[in-house]
Amino acid sequence: IMTTRVPEFWIAVVACHGPGEAHVAANRNPLRRYAVRRQAAAGTPDPTIVNPAHLGKELSAAVCARCHALIGGFHDAPDYPLHGYAFRPGQKFEDAFVRARLVDWQTNPALEAELAKNPQIIRDRYWSDGMIRVAGREYNGLLETKCFQNGEMSCLSCHKMHESDADPRSRPEWADDQLAPGMQTNTACLQCHKTFAGDAALAAHTHHPVASAASNCYNCHMPHTTFGLLKAIRSHTIDKPSVAASLATGRPNACNQCHLDKSLGWTALALNRWYGTPVPPMNADERDIAASVLWTLKGDAGQ
């Protein structure tokens, strides 16, 4: 275990809550502070400061994206060395940054110059289907996730940036991923996917023992796909195991990350048997040789 100390990673109050001068001035009055607390308890936030928890999913996620996004550039580039990012919490991400999903590199003329300077940028940072493959860019993964696109999921659905006094975990345990209490478990997904609550429903879905790693939603739908900060990091593109995707992109799938002695052919047959997933065409090596061995001997370091 490595323990480090830093004073600040440019992640102080303003980074998440915006400039606080007006907030401080307004709340010097203790009567106002009392009134604001009563209003907050009733669901009305203090208008003098930004609280990401009270923003919609896009604006809330944009606060995190300031640090956790792969960007194509920022609109205030000439002023950046002196003043930093122009982005302030509560703004749209696109107000300050050039969005950089894989499709943006392929369609946005504003990114052509950057791509011309570094033609490897797509291969180095994305899997060929658009999934982000570098650490610390979880916002890009979130953008590709149906739970975000079609639902109300945001970063704060699982993460909690301030440790609660009632949190039974130690400070290092909380700081590892900064997940809210209970969000290290299937409780995170059961916030929405309630049909899988209960041991019987879970086992019927996973086809694995309830207490096993394979019945942990994260391990199948958010497998570890990047490495950074001295650890493996989970994909934030919530997806399902797919042999077809592994064959098309070279990206390891959740099943073969656990079953290191099994081939893609074995996984394809299991997914077909359990979920009716079509078995994709594959060559003899992919059908018969352990996927972990194939990925070790060929492909690239991202595997």
Across the structure, where does each feature detected by a protein language model lie?
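Primarily the internal scaffold of c-type cytochrome electron-transfer domains
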Residues: 1-303
